[in-house]
């Protein structure tokens, strides 16, 4: 029997995916609505609230997939909400900055 794949949109590019028995968080933007400045400084971001409670986002994760390190894909609050030893998959050019944020299991 095939395992069901689930993809849940949390906000912006942030997704929680269940695939092959693993829980994957993609592009974690976890800051509160309107608490950050947009990349161009034009407006406050994120523009909408998270679609699920933080504990449902962070609990039981197996890994994080960061497509690229822009504020709308990875914000400063991520290091407050995720376990420091979680597997963090990212681009080679972003590995050092993720490690500097305290994450200890970063691969590219």
Regions found by a protein language model. Give the residues of each.
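Active-site beta-strand termini and strand-to-loop segments that position acidic
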Residues: 17-20
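Short gly/ser/thr-rich secondary-structure transition/capping motifs
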Residues: 5-9, 44-51, 69-70
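A short helix->loop->beta-strand "cap" motif at the edges of active sites that frequently abuts
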Residues: 22, 84-87, 103-104
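Metallo-beta-lactamase
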Residues: 2-4, 90-108
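Active-site environment of divalent metal-dependent phosphoester hydrolases
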Residues: 13, 31-33, 69-74, 95-98
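Pre-active-site segment of Zn-dependent metallo-hydrolases
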Residues: 22-65, 76-81
């Amino acid at each position: 029997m095939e395992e069901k794949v689930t993809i849940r949109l949390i906000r912006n590019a942030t997704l929680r995916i269940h695939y092959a028995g693993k829980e994957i968080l993609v592009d974690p933007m976890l800051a509160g609505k309107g608490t950050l400045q947009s990349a161009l400084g034009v407006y406050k971001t994120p523009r909408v609230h998270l679609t699920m409670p933080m504990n449902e986002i962070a609990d039981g994760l197996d890994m994080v997939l960061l497509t690229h390190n822009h504020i709308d894909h990875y914000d400063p609050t991520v290091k407050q909400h995720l376990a420091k030893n979680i597997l963090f998959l990212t681009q080679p050019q972003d590995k050092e900055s993720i490690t500097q944020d305290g994450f200890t299991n970063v691969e590219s």
